[in-house]
């Protein structure tokens, strides 16, 4: 119904009256074409859909982002846009990804294994160095235990 709203609606918008403008700006910066709110999501390409979702996350005002495979469906330009957004993001982020290029840009890698959750300082390259050193130390300890 036009012109009517509930008190809860106003509470949700408190401090976010410019959300439409901020989202429109984010869409332009992400090189998304203008589209209306009534356009069905399935009519967007995979890359457009991912960028639109990411724009929403970045303008949400959240303190922390939880992103699952955020580079999926993005072309090179879209991935570069995302890398820039993450570099300038002031909040925290937990990102699940298999994208090595994205992981090399992260300041910390957290590995989830069947038995543990392990945190490694540094990007993906540093993570690989640390894992290799751990594996070599484990092999040496095993050889020492056997002899």
Where are these regions (language model features)?
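ABC ATP-binding cassette signature C-motif
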Residues: 1-142
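Short cytosolic helices in intracellular loops of multi-pass membrane proteins
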Residues: 143-147
């Amino acid at each position: 119904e036009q012109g009517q709203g509930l008190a809860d609606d106003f509470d949700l918008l408190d401090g976010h009256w410019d959300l439409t403008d901020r989202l429109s700006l984010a869409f332009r910066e992400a090189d998304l074409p203008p589209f209306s709110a009534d356009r069905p999501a399935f009519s967007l390409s995979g890359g457009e859909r991912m960028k639109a979702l990411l724009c929403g996350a970045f303008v949400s005002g959240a303190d922390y982002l939880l992103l699952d495979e955020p580079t999926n469906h993005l072309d090179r330009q879209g991935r570069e846009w995302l890398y820039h957004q993450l570099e300038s993001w002031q909040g925290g982020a937990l990102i699940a990804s298999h994208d090595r290029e994205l992981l090399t840009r992260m300041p910390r890698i957290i590995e989830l294994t069947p038995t543990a959750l392990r945190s490694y300082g540094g990007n993906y390259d540093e993570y690989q160095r640390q894992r290799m050193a751990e594996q070599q130390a484990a092999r040496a300890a095993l050889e020492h235990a056997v002899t």
